[in-house]
Amino acid sequence: MSVTLHTSLGDIKVEIFCDSVPLASENFLALCASNYYNNTIFHRNIKGFMIQGGDPTNTGRGGESIWKKQFKDEFPSHLKHNTRGILSMANSGPDTNGSQFFITYGKHRSLNKVYTVFGKIIAGIEVLDLMEKVPVDDKDLPLNEIILKSVTIHANPIANQ
């Protein structure tokens, strides 16, 4: 199962791990299908670490899950922050997942069992390279907006349930 994130810097194709992390996958796919992420910005960009988006208020403080409440973390042992291009749920503590997500710029073992991994980049890693080079202010907000214009779902197993 995959989706393409159509950003202002180009397209990133991401494999979604539906079987391994069903809650995070269902939430992300349903939000994508409802155009929830359309025209949102990546509001946090830390070179060497990650880029974060998924907040419809574009402040870094908003967003909610499809269930209108926070949902539990999922930590299968085989999914780790072990390379560049890992897609994970952002949270503010245990079991506080909503709509925000981030993509890693490198391997970060300290994130394992803290943030739910639910996907990885399978095409368009060069777009992630461009994102990492965008200058930021003192709050890690990109000085030139990086916009998630839309998302294309290539196959949605949840739609058939």
UniProtKB/Swiss-Prot annotation:
Q: What's the top EC group for this one?
A: isomerase
Molecular function terms in GO for this entry? peptidyl-prolyl cis-trans isomerase activity
Catalyses: [protein]-peptidylproline (omega=180) = [protein]-peptidylproline (omega=0)
Q: Which UniProt keywords apply?
A: Isomerase, Rotamase
Q: Which GO terms describe its cellular component?
A: catalytic step 2 spliceosome
The PPIase cyclophilin-type domain covers 1-153
The keyword NAD is assigned to this record: no
Instruction: Decide whether keyword Ribosomal protein is in the record.
Output: no
Pfam families the record matches = Pro_isomerase (PF00160)
Superkingdom of origin:
Eukaryota
Q: Which Gene3D superfamilies match?
A: Cyclophilin-like (2.40.100.10)
Name of this chain's protein: Peptidyl-prolyl cis-trans isomerase-like 3
**Species the sequence originates in:** Dictyostelium discoideum
Q: Which gene encodes it?
A: ppil3
